[in-house]
Amino acid sequence: MLENMPKVIYFNVTTSLPQGFYLRIPGKECSRGDYIVYEPSEEVKTLIIKNGWGDGERDFLKKVGAVAGEKYSVDAKTLRFEIEGKYIGQVYETDNKGNALPKLRGEFEVPEGYLLPIATSARSFDGRYVGVISEKRVKARVIPILTW
């Protein structure tokens, strides 16, 4: 019977965002700054398995960095990641194991029905590497309730 109940509490063990417990909140309409849980694309899942980062079965917990109509960029020379002209962080060419990371370079605008997921950790695998995700992939909006 419990298997049919929606997930209410999420536990984040990664360093992409503060580790701890996050509570699901009503609605899926996202605004910049919201925390979301989403299913990564098949392409991302394949890369996760290939690079030994996990089994590709886990959902991602990130913040919404940009929504439809907003612009983001990765400078090809400096590898600076910016949203609406504001510096967010660096982009790395390899992970901690030396595996090549996807190379997203240039200026982009978030299309309607999509959002750009980001994290606070400089080493997080987020939109700075793979770009936007469809809003349809969002499983929940969450808020932190106990983090460290």
List each language-model region with its residue ranges.
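Mid-length scaffold segments of soluble, non-membrane domains
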Residues: 55-90
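Acidic/glycine-rich C-terminal interaction modules and beta/coil loop segments
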Residues: 90-142, 146
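Surface loops and adjacent helix of pleckstrin homology
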Residues: 27, 41, 76-77, 84-86, ...
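Protein maturation boundaries and topogenic segments
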Residues: 1-59, 76, 107-109, 128-148
